Amino acid sequence: MKTIIYSPGDPAGIGPDLFLSLLNEDFFRLIKANVVCLGDKNLFESRASELGYDLTFDFFSNIDDLQDKIGYLEILKCPDVSSGILNSVNSEYVINNLDYGIDSCLQNKNTGLVTGPISKENLVEGGYIFSGHTERI
């Protein structure tokens, strides 16, 4: 079965909200693929609460454990899960999620990557050289 990995981008932005909104609308049940969202458990639980969504989360420690499901894979803890406030302390979290998604696609031809919005300025402020998703991929 094919797998779609979603790297939600900056935790302060709309990326996590987009995924949660689609999950809340049961959109992913229509897709004939495993769907994996990369991210911190606390981030998604707190954001779902902010949005008023009553969702159940399945977190996995290994992408290979996901079979015919929608799940979350926590690569790294997010230092600041505040919505709407950019914080460069999250730069490593954002880059690690993106790089994990890229590496997974390179290792498995049945895996696709969808990326959420990233603040380039915030990543540079966090110490990373980053000019965009396309260049990094």
Regions found by a protein language model. Give the residues of each.
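Contiguous, glycine/small-aliphatic-enriched amphipathic segments in soluble metabolic enzymes
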Residues: 1-136
